[in-house]
Regions:
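Intrinsically disordered, low-complexity regulatory segments
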Residues: 1-181, 463-466, 477
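Basic, low-complexity terminal or inter-domain segments flanking catalytic cores
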Residues: 2, 22, 123, 199, ...
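Structured, non-catalytic alpha/beta "coupling" segments that mediate domain-domain communication
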Residues: 19, 23-53, 204-247, 398-443, ...
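Phosphate-interacting basic helix/loop segments used at nucleotide- and nucleic-acid interfaces
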Residues: 73-94, 100, 207-209, 286, ...
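C-terminal or mid-to-C-terminal helical accessory/interaction module adjacent to the motor/catalytic core
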Residues: 88, 142-232, 267-271
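Metal- or metallocofactor-binding catalytic centers and their adjacent structured scaffolds
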Residues: 160, 164, 247-276
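Structured, charged N-terminal subsegments at the starts of enzyme catalytic cores
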Residues: 273, 278, 282-291, 299
Length: 670
C-alpha cells in the first residue's frame, strides 16, 4: 500500500479526484491519501530544548543569557493545538504502508512543504519503519492530469536527510528559531508596557525599509528651483547638466542664450517586451490600494486555486515553463473574452524567451485551466475581489501574447548650445500596453510630439522631487530587488505585520499606504544600524538555502553559528540607540480622536478606531456627515466578518460617550 501525504484538505480532495478516491488503485498500485493541516508540530520552547542545568538560562529574557549555544539544543518538537485526532488518524492510515509519498507543496527556495511532512514522519516514528520507501511527488498544479503524471514519476529518496529539500527546510527552520535571540535582546531595551518588538530577519528589514522611507518623506522640504533651459516649437524641453539651479527666479542670468535651431542627433525605432508576470506580492500591492486587506486577497486566491481557476499561489517564479504555456494556449480566446480583451491584439501566440523558461516549478501567478463561464459566475462564487484578482492575472498572462510595445526614440540638442539635450519617446504601436491598460505599473515616459525645429531660451520653474511615500507595492518592489522572500512570503509577512487586531503589529496599512505603529516606530529607532535589520543578512540566509545541494554549497551550520557574533554586535548597537532615543516610550498613546458636531449642534469627539480597526480618512468624513458605513474585515472563530454602523451617543458602565455605534454584523462588505 502506498500512503500519500497531502498538505491540506483541499489538496487531498483534488488528489482523490485525480486518482479515483481517497483509497483505491491507480496505475496498478494501491494507495491511500491523507492530509496535513499546515504545521502539525513546532519546536518546543528554548528552555525545554536543553539539559536541566541550563533550563534557567534559556528561560530568562536577559542579556546576560545571550547568546545561546546551538549545540545545547535537542530540537524537540511539540504538537500544535487541536491536532492530536488528526495525527492519530494519519498514523493509523500510514503505519501499514510500504511506501509513503511526500506530496506536499514544492517550495524550491525554503523547502517549507517538505518540512511539514518531515515533522510528521519524525515525530510519529514512521520514518524509522524498517524497509519503508519514502518518495517525493512534485506537481506544479492540482489538475488531474498533473497529479496523475506526478504520481507515475515520483522519485524515491534513498536517504531523506541528504535530500536538498530536506536540508534546506531544516536549515531555515533552525536559523529562524535561533534568531529568536534578537527579539529577546530587543525586549531587554523595550518598556514592558509597549509589548515585545518581534525582530525576525524579514520583519526587522521591513520596519527598517519603511522607517527610512518615512523619514525621507516626512523630512523633505518642498523647494522650487529656477534654471535656464530651452523649449522647442513642439514644447519639448532641453536641459543642460552644467546649468546651475537657482533658489529664486531673479538670480537666473537672462542674457546668456538666444534662439537657435534644433539638431536631431539620432532617431531609432525601439521596442519593449511585456513586464514580468505577477507574484502574490505584486498582486497584493496593486489590489491593496482599493482597500482590500492582505488576508482577503490571500484567502480569496486560495479558494480560486483550489478550484483550478488560478495557478498555485505561493510560487517563487516570475516566468512559466513551456509546458505551462502550452497548457493555457488553447484557452486563450476564452480567457480573453471573459476579461474583455480584444482577441485580435493577441497576435504573438508563441513562447517568449523573456517569459517562458525552463527550470521553474509552479510558474508565475496566472489563470488556471478551469476557465469560468462569465464574470458574473466569478463574482457569485468569489465576490468582487475574485473578479479583480482574475482580471489582473488574466491580463498579465494575455499581455505576453501581444506584440512588443514599439516607439520612436529621438535624441536632439540645441544647435548653438549643444549641452542642452533632450530624449523623447513617441508611441507607434501599443502592443501589450493595449492589453494591460492601467495595470502597467512600470510605464515608460512617453511624449506625443517629435523634435521641433526652433528652440527658445526660457527660465524653467521646477521643484525638487519628493521622496516616495512607502506603499505595499513600493515595498514589495524593494524586497524583490534584494531577493527577500518569495512573492507569497512578502505578501503574508506584510499582512501579518499590519494586522490591526494584533496589539504587537508593527505596520499600519491604509489602502496600501504604510506607516509604523507606535511599537513599530520604537523598533525602527532601536534597531537602526543592526545586523538583523540589514537586508544583507536575509540575502545570506536565502543564498545559503539556494546553495544547498549544489557544488557551491555554503556550510549551513557555519551560517547558523555566525548568529552569536551578529547578536553581540546588535546588542551594543541597540544599547547605543536606546541611549540616544529622545522620545519617551514608557506610555502607550491613547487612540487619536476627531471632533464633530452632533445632532444637537454640540462639538464632540470620537475615537478614530473601533475594536482595533482604524478609520480611514474616507471613513471619518462619511461618519462626520452622518453616514452609515461598513468597516472591517475582523477575524472571528468562524472566519471574517464586517461591522455596519454610524456615530451616535452610547452608554458604557453608566458613562455616556459619542462614537461608532454598531448596527449589525455582516458576512461581506458587498
Amino acid at each position: 500500500m502506498i500512503g500519500i501525504i497531502c498538505e491540506k484538505p483541499s489538496a487531498r480532495r483534488n488528489f482523490a479526484k485525480a486518482l479515483g478516491g481517497d483509497t483505491g488503485v491507480y496505475n496498478g498500485e494501491k494507495y491511500v491519501i491523507v492530509n496535513l493541516r499546515g504545521h502539525l508540530y513546532k519546536y518546543d520552547e528554548p528552555h525545554k530544548q536543553v539539559n536541566k542545568e541550563l533550563e534557567n538560562k534559556y528561560k530568562q529574557w536577559t542579556l546576560d543569557n545571550l547568546p545561546w549555544s546551538y549545540t545545547d539544543f535537542k530540537w524537540k518538537r511539540v504538537k500544535v493545538s487541536d491536532v492530536v485526532p488528526l495525527i492519530n488518524s494519519i498514523k493509523k492510515e500510514l503505519e501499514n504502508c510500504s511506501e509513503i509519498v511526500i506530496a506536499t507543496d514544492y517550495d524550491a527556495v525554503s523547502g517549507e512543504g517538505f518540512l511539514l511532512a518531515l515533522e510528521l514522519l519524525e515525530e510519529t516514528g514512521l520514518i524509522n519503519k524498517k524497509n519503508l520507501i519514502i518518495s517525493r511527488m512534485i506537481f506544479l498544479d492540482e489538475t488531474p492530469s498533473t497529479i496523475q503524471k506526478a504520481f507515475k514519476e515520483r522519485t524515491v529518496l534513498e536517504d531523506i536527510y541528504k535530500n536538498a529539500e530536506c536540508r534546506k527546510s531544516l536549515f531555515r527552520s533552525r536559523w529562524d528559531y535561533t534568531s529568536q535571540q534578537f527579539t529577546r535582546a530587543a525586549k531587554a531595551f523595550t518598556p514592558a508596557k509597549l509589548g515585545t518588538p518581534r525582530q525576525g530577519r524579514l520583519k526587522s528589514y521591513i520596519v527598517s525599509e519603511v522607517g527610512q522611507a518615512l523619514d525621507k518623506y516626512n523630512n523633505h522640504i518642498d523647494k522650487k528651483f529656477w534654471q535656464n533651459r530651452f523649449i522647442d516649437d513642439n514644447e519639448n524641453i532641453y536641459v543642460s547638466s552644467k546649468e546651475t539651479k537657482y533658489d529664486t527666479k531673479e538670480e537666473v542670468p537672462t542674457d546668456k542664450y538666444k534662439q537657435s535651431t534644433v539638431t536631431k542627433e539620432s532617431e531609432q525605432m525601439k521596442q519593449s517586451p511585456p513586464p514580468r508576470m505577477y507574484d502574490m506580492a505584486k498582486l497584493t500591492g496593486v489590489l491593496a490600494s482599493s482597500g482590500y486587506s492582505v488576508a482577503q486577497i490571500k484567502n480569496t486566491y486560495q479558494k480560486m486555486y483550489e478550484n483550478s481557476v488560478l495557478s498555485y499561489p505561493r510560487t517563487s517564479d516570475s516566468t512559466i515553463t513551456l509546458e505551462q504555456f502550452n497548457e493555457l494556449l488553447p484557452l486563450v480566446d476564452k480567457i480573453a473574452e471573459l476579461v474583455n480583451v480584444d482577441k485580435d491584439l493577441l497576435s504573438y501566440r508563441k513562447p517568449r524567451a523573456t517569459h517562458i523558461k525552463d527550470g521553474g516549478s509552479h510558474g508565475a501567478n496566472r489563470p488556471g485551466v478551469n476557465v469560468p463561464k462569465s464574470i458574473e459566475q466569478i463574482e457569485s462564487v468569489y465576490g468582487k475581489l475574485g473578479v479583480r484578482i482574475y482580471t489582473v492575472l488574466a491580463k498579465s498572462f494575455l499581455s505576453i501574447l501581444a506584440p512588443n510595445y514599439e516607439y520612436l526614440q529621438q535624441k536632439g540638442f540645441v544647435t548653438d548650445y549643444p549641452d542642452f539635450k533632450t530624449t523623447i519617446n513617441i508611441p507607434k504601436k501599443a502592443g501589450w500596453k493595449a492589453v494591460l491598460g492601467n495595470l502597467n505599473t512600470d510605464d515608460e515616459e512617453e511624449t506625443g510630439k517629435e523634435l521641433g525645429k526652433i528652440a527658445e531660451p526660457i527660465i524653467f520653474e521646477g521643484e525638487y522631487p519628493k521622496p516616495k511615500y512607502p506603499t505595499i507595492l513600493w515595498l514589495t518592489k524593494q524586497m524583490e530587488k534584494y531577493n527577500v522572500g518569495t512573492g507569497a512570503t512578502r505578501a503574508s509577512t506584510i499582512g501579518e505585520m499590519s494586522n490591526s487586531k494584533d496589539k504587537s503589529s508593527l505596520l499600519e496599512n491604509n489602502k496600501g499606504r504604510l506607516s509604523l505603529t507606535y511599537l513599530g516606530q520604537y523598533s525602527y529607532n532601536l534597531t537602526k544600524g543592526t545586523n538583523i535589520a540589514n537586508v544583507k543578512l536575509t540575502e545570506k540566509v536565502i543564498n545559503t538555502m539556494g546553495s544547498i545541494g549544489t557544488k557551491d554549497e555554503i556550510n549551513p551550520l557555519s551560517v547558523i553559528k555566525e548568529i552569536d557574533n551578529l547578536l553581540l554586535e546588535d546588542i551594543e548597537t541597540m544599547k547605543k540607540n536606546r541611549e540616544e532615543m529622545q522620545i519617551a516610550y514608557s506610555e502607550r498613546p491613547q487612540p487619536e480622536k476627531h471632533s464633530v458636531t452632533d445632532k444637537k449642534g454640540n462639538t464632540v469627539e470620537f475615537k478614530k478606531e473601533w475594536n482595533g480597526y482604524k478609520f480611514t480618512d474616507e471613513d471619518i468624513e462619511a461618519l462626520s456627515n452622518g453616514e452609515t458605513i461598513i468597516i472591517g474585515p475582523f477575524q472571528g472563530k468562524k472566519g471574517q466578518y464586517f461591522a455596519k454602523g454610524k456615530l451616535d451617543w452610547q452608554t458604557y458602565k453608566k458613562r455616556k460617550f459619542y462614537g461608532f455605534s454598531l448596527v449589525e454584523f455582516l458576512n461581506s462588505k458587498d
